Amino acid sequence: MSVDPMAYEAQFFGFTPQTCLLRIYIAFQDHLFEVMQAVEQVILKKLEGIPDCEISSIQTRKCTEKFLCFMKGRFDNLFGKMEQLILQSILQIPPNILLPEDKCQETNPFSEEKFQLLKQEIKELQEKYKVELCTEQALLAELEEQKTVKAKLRETLTFFDELENIGRYQGTSNFRESLVSLVQNCRKLQDIRDNVEKEGKRLETQ
């Protein structure tokens, strides 16, 4: 069988010419075996009708196999010539013929060098895309962080507004004075808590 892949012919026919010829070869070979088996059965029946025949069925089988090998050799020789003729004259697309789907190659030829350049360009674009994707993810993470900081800042401003309102309620309009007053009140509360704890411990020891 031919070792030429004949890829262009396979694209057109939908099968490789070698595969087609291999199936034909197997079909002919199977038919030859079947014919020889039928001939052998006929010979054996004819021999059974001959009285005192010295030819046994084993001898008949050996002769049949020998003849089959001879026929197979002749068939292989003829099929090899037929295969060469079919592959070169029937199932081969001439080199100057383009399939309809490849007509664009005639007006826009694409060399191996251009193909490699295109692959390199695609690779560079993929790398740029990965960098852009990482940058986008970093920006999104930073944006989420800014949202968190903004929320905390709002909480802090709200807290200071509440402190200022407390100062106004106590008659202090200045924020610094309100903060000082708040600190003093906190210290007073701490002193009261300490005194309560001491008094509680003293009562427990009595």
UniProtKB/Swiss-Prot annotation:
The keyword Cell division applies. Part of the MIS12 complex which is required for normal chromosome alignment and segregation and for kinetochore formation during mitosis. Essential for proper kinetochore microtubule attachments. This is Protein MIS12 homolog. Component of the MIS12 complex composed of MIS12, DSN1, NSL1 and PMF1. Also interacts with KNL1, CBX3, CBX5, NDC80 and ZWINT. Belongs to the mis12 family. It comes from the Eukaryota. Keywords: Cell cycle, Cell division, Centromere, Chromosome, Chromosome partition, Coiled coil, Kinetochore, Mitosis. The keyword Cell division applies.
